[in-house]
Amino acid sequence: MPEYRSKTSTYGRNMAGARALWRATGMKDDDFQKPIIAIANSFTQFVPGHVHLKDLGQLVAREIERLGGVAKEFNTIAVDDGIAMGHDGMLYSLPSREIIADSVEYMANAHCADALVCISNCDKITPGMLMASLRLNIPTVFVSGGPMEAGKTTLADHKLDLVDAMVLAADPHASDEEVATVERSACPTCGSCSGMFTANSMNCLTEALGLSLPGNGTVVATHSDRKQLFLNAGRTVIELCHRWYGAEDATALPRGIATFAAFENAITLDIAMGGSTNTILHLLAAAQEAQVSFTMQDIDRLSRNVPQLCKVAPNTQKYHIEDVHRAGGIFGILAELARGNLLHTDVATVHSKTLGEAIATWDIIGTQDEAVHTFYKAGSAGIPTQVAFSQSTRWPSLDTDRTEGCIRDMEHAFSKEGGLAVLYGNIAQDGCVVKTAGVDASIHVFEGSALVYESQEAAVKGILSDEVQPGMIVVIRYEGPKGGPGMQEMLYPTSYLKSKGLGKQCALFTDGRFSGGTSGLSIGHASPEAAAGGAIGLIRDGDRIRIDIPQRAINVLISEEELASRRLEQHAIGWKPAQSRTRKVSSALKAYSLLATSADKGAVRNKTLL
């Protein structure tokens, strides 16, 4: 049987010094025979999705210790993409994913931890910890801080979120008082932003991957039911330790759970729920850490066959994550996919022998278990707070309407093709991605003239000064992982296009990426990126570009000869922005840029350069 990794620092006379230090942390004689379980917390007062996590690591620790383990907590960094957005701070967001992954690896390996509990929540923290867990391949459970409650105001008859505040702020017809009212109401509680944005998308995907417990992605941060998820995470990691160290059960390890089939399940869910395009970036990166050959081609293949069964903000104003929970949560969607034979139900999870068994237990349509029904009735209280587990509101009934409800069955899908698509063409030879769930059907085929910007800042200035007119395709380049560096999110440009009434009359194409809050004909992750010699760097003002989502195509309408001529010309002067940028790029960001791959590889480090 495998020995505890921690034995390296706890066993033998020569480890007396290490044990002396362990004792200084509070360990006793009998603790040296127990598994040492690392708790990777991500508490910070900078991020609403993490502001309530301070004491939750110790909640898990006490449960681990009660059940015979030794718990040791540490913290990672966490960047708030919304606060970092619109200025040079966004350059640091995606690179922080690698820092988080490395920091978890460093702590777990430096101290020979036997297992891991990841307390994550927001945009790059869950992906970074996911990458680390698959890299380490020790028993691991994920538990998130949970989603924020949606906001409410008398100015609108629908719920609010962060994007509403951003769009209204750029609307010249809105008064300062209206903007202030929405600003104060859009983000009322702690938790990750309330729509199907990147953070919530990733926390939902950990359920499909099998690495977190049911409800992880959908129980709001303020609800008392989430406390039980944290306690159960402590119990589950102890069980996983017994299964691996006591019985050498490989399905207790992240790589034994997150197999190729599990990654197919995750992207199938992603497509069905119209998740953030960032999830593609992060799943590709995680798959590489899992040593799974999961690529853009696999995503393209699945996107053609999976319908959209759930539509949530920003793709609609009707539903937020709290409504998904009321409709049965992620297992409600997984159950419908399973009924359509679109899932691998024989894969393992941290909490059930197979995903199929878990679906049978947690599907509100298929089970009569009152405890399960009660669990999915957990709702929001509408009381502004930064305190976790502070309310116990329950919906009077579940949303079991699979015809017109938040979650649909296969027959009544929101669309027959899913919410994410991969496009290819002469300006995205290795692919680019679009969240079709947020694109109006009238512009699934769109042709327009290019208006090229060499930075997000220039594009924002151009949009706000009315340079962008109906029928144009805004091209923002040199914003990829290497060229930015850091692959900035383009939520401000897309929000401002909406504010100008151009959401259905223009498109945006970039080698950067988009916030999970983005909707509209916004196509990102163009690969190769401009800084790596990608053809997006060859587009000129006035070029006609044709986007054809049904055919999964995007092309600039010029001859191959002209494209080749431009390539030679660009190669001679170097792949860099035509206009100089005032952007301050630190040595840390330069180091990231030197190793960064394009988005089709997950923007991970190019290991061939190491």
UniProtKB/Swiss-Prot annotation:
PANTHER family recorded for this chain? Answer: D-XYLONATE DEHYDRATASE, D-XYLONATE DEHYDRATASE YAGF-RELATED
Taxonomically, what lineage is the organism? Bacteria, Pseudomonadati, Pseudomonadota, Gammaproteobacteria, Lysobacterales
- This chain's source organism reads Xylella fastidiosa (strain M12)
Protein name per the record: Dihydroxy-acid dehydratase
N6-carboxylysine: residues bearing it: K124
GO aspect biological process, one term: isoleucine biosynthetic process
Q: Which Pfam families match?
A: ILV_EDD_C (PF24877), ILVD_EDD_N (PF00920)
Catalytic residues (UniProt):
S515 (proton acceptor)
EC number of this enzyme? 4.2.1.9
Report the superkingdom from the record.
Bacteria
